[in-house]
Amino acid sequence: NDYLDRAKELVFTDIEGRTEWLPEVGHGKMFGVLLVSRDGGTPSHCAPLLHDIGGASALFAYSGQILGRSYWQGYVPAIFDYLQPDGYFKRHEARITDLNRRIAAMGQSEDLAHARRELCEARELAGREVERYRAFIKEQKATRTVQEAQYQNAELRRIKQRAAQSVAAAQAQVDAIVAQMEGLRTERRKRSDALQRWLFTQHRLTSPTGEARPRLDVFADYARRTGSQQLMPPSGTGECCAPRLLNYANTHRLRPIAIAEFWYGASPK
């Protein structure tokens, strides 16, 4: 499609002119263009985002963010901008980030390292004590009386029991710290899942008929119709170029005609 090729060239030219972008997008970024018709009448605020490509109109988009921003002039914005500094997402993301920091700090803490050293030493000491007494029993085997043999066997059991208790106490110190870390990991997972679900409910997709629904509902309906096990949308659903372009067109009474996505920058590995 000549119009799509022309739109793609305009995007490449625009990217090259945005020098602040190049260090980031040079590593690789997905861009997209959508040819649209204005049959339904176009709201005036859409005009800055419509690009004239010589007889046709096009919308431009990029996936995700560029320099931490979901919107740059000339490109359609994210379907739902969740990156406001003081917004719900950022506040809860900060809590998850803090949990990551605490988990990492505990994993590298001197308390955990000391507890693990104590456990290793307890195991080594226990092994030495048991083997030392076994060697003693072996030396005494030829000359000991029945009563001495009974005592020595009982003493060996007592030594093993004390050794096991010592190792168990040291293991408990390690386990206590690991349990705290697991508790933080569980909290992190729950918070992450809850935040992802919140994002899915806030992220509303608009159909060509103008019906807007949370993407969580869209995936749930698809799962019911098809028997799919994919009840939750994959992370990042709706952040790609095509959903952004189509959603913007559907929301602003623009009729999609043709779409193309293309890669700019280094090839993905």
Question: Where does each model-flagged region fall?
Answer:
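Catalytic cores of nucleic-acid editing and processing enzymes
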Residues: N1-K269
